[in-house]
Amino acid sequence: LIGTGKSVAALSKLLPDPDLAYMARYALERIPAEVAVLALRQAVIQTRGPTQIGIINSLAAREDEGAAGILIELLANADQEVVGAAVNALGKIGTLKTAAALERFQGTAPDSLRRQVGMARLAAAQGLARRGQRSEAAKVFHQLYTQETFDPLRVGGLRGLIMTEPTQATELLMAALTEGDGPLRKLAVRLLVEQPADYPLAPFLEKLPTLPAPEQVALLEVVRLRSESSARAAVRNACDSRETEVRLAALRAMAAVGNAEDVIFLAKVAAGEAPECAAGRLALASMPGPEPDRTILEQLPGAQPPVRIELIRALAARGIRAGATLLPDQLSQ
């Protein structure tokens, strides 16, 4: 587009025309001159129905803070589609004024718009955070996290709180992991994975044996995804859990955090019963580093037959070329 402020007068005349308004809006959205946004503000007052909704969307696309007053007035419009568009626009603009207006409106909004208003409040809080108004954003995030029942709002509120109040991240994540329901637990797992490499998992691992099985599985998945070697002892203990799902999750994590000391243990698991045998076999094949390779080579000749079979399988799975010299002797046994 090459439109300038000189084009605005001609374009603004097209805004009331239902057939031409779209292209006029498209052009005006992209003209940086102040006169372009003034034309959109004027037109949103003068139009109705789909055309008005389109202009509201254009004001939202420009994140026009100067249109906030007009959009707030439109929250009282009789046309619910217009109201919905105004709600979205106020969220997109994301200032203290629009966030406050959305909070007030949420108390009186019709049921059909409540979730939409909540999502707009979430967008407004994200806008405040981007502008550096972190404490104001955190207040909105906290309300959404603690007061809403719609999962995307609670999840968005928690994510926003951790972003704006990082000193509370451990407390918030611990609560979500140990006290939250499915969506919050899943988010806690994702957020733990996203934390910096030096983020301490120790407080969470201390709670591991006391957590319900689903939460233990979730935390073990975090360990696996982060390859958290410092968690090895906790993971090894979880391999002895009474819960099958926890044992399997721990064995999957051993693939990422196990070491040479775990070779025989995993080989015995692999030689055992399903479903753990497959997980043990995969962990034995996947443990990082060369040390497990050396242990496999050292332990293979003297191992009991079921364990020896699993160590031979691990030779192939890990591509341990030095093991080729041992195989002829194994064929004679």
Residue ranges and their predicted role:
Residues 2-3, 28-35, 59, 63, ...:
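Alpha-solenoid repeat junctions
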Residues 2-15, 33-45, 53, 64-76, ...:
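Amphipathic alpha-helical scaffolding segments comprising HEAT/armadillo-like alpha-solenoid repeats
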Residues 16-20, 47-48, 78-79, 109-110, ...:
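Short inter-helical turns and helix N-cap capping residues of alpha-solenoid HEAT/ARM repeat scaffolds
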Residues 19-23, 50-54, 67, 81-83, ...:
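Positions within the helices of HEAT/ARM-like alpha-solenoid repeats
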Residues 25, 79-109, 123-127, 183-189, ...:
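Generic detector of contiguous secondary-structure segments
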Residues 115-118, 138:
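Start-of-helix signal in alpha-solenoid helical-repeat scaffolds, especially tetratricopeptide repeats
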